[in-house]
């Protein structure tokens, strides 16, 4: 279970984010909803057999508007992959009965094969905060030492101890500010 939210105005209405089995794929994951205090449950969001819901949050004062964080993961005893195309953010405007994916390539939020675990916090109807365990690799930038303003990481790789000890403190501090 990733998260359970209870309607503050109706304690019989609950929405549950289910992450799924830890080491195997299964279809019993996604979002489940009950309106009768748990006597019956309906799966209202299913993405795939390796993507579950790790977080749920609703707008304070408006249980109808809620957000869900989907997390695709594949855990084995010998390996863990915590990212995938299934990871993303979904929105419901009817208390968790229907869901629409709001994250994607055009949303401005990182999406795709390297999107990882997402945490959510809702401030109001217009403000959603999301934190992403981003598995996207940054492209390596080549720095020309002759055009550089100062020290570079590659300079340290080939630097002798004596050269390092003779570095100007101002130049070293500038490097640390740029890269620290």
Model-derived regions: residue spans:
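Beta-propeller blade termini and top-face loops
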Residues: 1-180
């Amino acid at each position: 279970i990733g998260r359970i939210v209870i309607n503050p105005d109706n304690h019989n209405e609950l929405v549950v984010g289910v992450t799924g089995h830890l080491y195997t794929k299964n279809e019993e994951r996604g979002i489940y909803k009950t309106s009768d205090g748990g006597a019956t449950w309906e799966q209202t969001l299913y993405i795939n057999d390796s993507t579950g819901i790790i977080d749920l949050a609703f707008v304070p004062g408006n249980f109808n508007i809620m957000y869900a964080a989907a997390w695709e993961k594949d855990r084995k005893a010998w390996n863990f992959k915590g990212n995938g195309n299934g990871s993303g953010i979904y929105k419901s405007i009817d208390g968790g009965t229907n869901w629409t994916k709001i994250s994607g390539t055009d949303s401005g939020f990182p999406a795709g094969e390297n999107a990882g675990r997402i945490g959510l916090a809702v401030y109001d109807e217009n403000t959603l905060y999301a934190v992403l365990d981003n598995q996207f690799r940054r492209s390596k930038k080549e720095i020309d030492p002759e055009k550089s303003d100062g020290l570079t990481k590659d300079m340290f790789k080939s630097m002798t101890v004596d050269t390092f000890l003779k570095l100007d403190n101002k130049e070293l501090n500038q490097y640390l500010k740029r890269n620290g």
